[in-house]
Amino acid sequence: MKRVYLSVRLKNYEDALSLIGARCVETPREADLLLLPGGGDVHPRFYGRALGGAADIDEARDGRELALVDEFLRAGKPVVGICRGLQLLNVYFGGTLHQHILGHAQVCGRDRLHVVHAAPGLLRTLYGARFTVNSAHHQAVGTLGEELQVLACAPDGTVEAIAHESLPVFAVQWHPERLCGAFTRSEAVDGAKLLSALLR
């Protein structure tokens, strides 16, 4: 059973992890893997920009999660990011963010759905070259971080998945934990397949 450290304990993530046979642990030392979940925006000072659209900021969380990424990677342990987690990882590797984009946030409290196009690799193996995911974000990758690769994009060019060229880092902009179990949507992919593959 894979032991996962959630940087912020959120029930829907815990439920999704339980569904695939993973277990959340209380301390980073116990964990096999770090999972950075969704949440508010990363403060732009961490990527050398002034405030210009970022909202719901928690600088203490930003600093703590950046330190956790450093801790896990130094230990050779994988790091997985979801939504904000992808954005934070891009910042960690020296990238920037678009502080506000249109067309990707929730509508009336419900995740949007849109198509993404995947490069050859894990995502294409799991879901094919073109598949539908959910969307609930208003920020996105600007300048790509050093040694990061884009694995999937939305039709408008928004980066939807990244991985590091040599380190065990993988992240998606969508929410696989909200595409499995009670949150399964017939129009979109099965999020449990991705979570299972990442935690294998």
PLM feature spans:
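Conserved SAM-binding loop
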Residues: 85
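N-terminal beta1-alpha1 cap of cysteine-dependent amidohydrolase-like domains
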Residues: 1-82, 91-92, 98, 102-127, ...
